[in-house]
């Protein structure tokens, strides 16, 4: 929250990611708030979570008139019309270049620290290509040695598309993450050809439907009509319907594979 900084929910979610060894990306929202203070919020994140917190963006005009930011990964200025949506991408203004370059160098150094070859190149040239930066950041996310910080005004759709682009292009693939273990302590590899295992993490009750169970496919494949064993109960359950999720919408599918997130209905 751009007004109040890290709150109890932030800290609780961070503890969960720490326990599960998951990547972390911080998102500073409500940049259009009258009381927004980006730099104070960023300082709070660094004070709590340390130097792993690395800003990717900073706003140019936080507050009620917010409509532009600098992206120090792509070294571009992003701005939006009042209705938000697709950004206008331009060169960084001359008066912001020194600040942007300083933050870019810090980002490059943090990314290079995650790979020996990248570190050697950084020592030689003090620069990395855009693709090399993505590799370094991806490894930093997987090992939790980097916590990137992004800026958005979600209600006005400013910055959201750039964040989604980053998630699609940079966030680690499931097979690049540390291995997980099942309740028996056995390693579960995200292999679509391995035996099927699902991890159910949420149940929601919806009108006219009842229970909707959300899960991640940890290994193998799951199909509509499959009979799987509920390891908590020791009983068989049939996956009568299978969906993938797109926001509030459910899309019926016939198969999901390791790494996919989906949902089903009316399990016992």
Each model region followed by its residue ranges:
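Structural and coupling elements of P-loop NTPases
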Residues: 1-268
């Amino acid at each position: 929250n751009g007004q109040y900084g890290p709150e109890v929910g932030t800290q609780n979610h961070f503890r969960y990611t720490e326990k599960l060894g998951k990547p972390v990306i911080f998102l500073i929202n409500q940049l259009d708030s009258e009381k927004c203070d980006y730099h104070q919020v960023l300082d709070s994140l660094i004070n709590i979570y340390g130097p792993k917190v690395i800003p990717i963006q900073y706003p140019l005009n936080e507050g009620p008139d917010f409509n532009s930011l600098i992206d120090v990964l792509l070294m571009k200025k992003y701005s939006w019309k009042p209705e938000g949506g697709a950004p206008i991408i331009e060169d960084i203004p001359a008066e912001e270049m020194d600040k942007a370059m300083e933050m870019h160098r810090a980002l490059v150094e943090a990314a290079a620290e995650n790979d020996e070859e990248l570190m050697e190149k950084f020592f030689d040239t003090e620069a990395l290509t855009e693709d090399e930066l993505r590799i370094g950041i991806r490894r930093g996310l997987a090992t939790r040695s980097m916590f990137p910080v992004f800026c958005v005004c979600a209600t006005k759709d400013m910055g959201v598309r750039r964040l989604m682009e980053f998630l699609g292009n940079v966030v680690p693939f499931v097979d690049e993450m540390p291995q997980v273990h099942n309740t028996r302590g056995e390693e579960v590899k995200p292999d679509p050809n391995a035996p099927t295992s699902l991890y159910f993490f949420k149940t929601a009750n919806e009108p006219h439907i009842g229970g909707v169970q959300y899960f991640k496919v940890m290994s193998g494949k799951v199909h509509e009509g499959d009979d799987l064993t509920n390891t908590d109960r020791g009983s068989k359950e049939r996956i009568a319907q299978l969906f993938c999720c797109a926001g509030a919408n459910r899309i019926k599918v016939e198969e999901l594979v390791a790494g996919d997130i989906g949902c089903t209905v009316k399990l016992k």
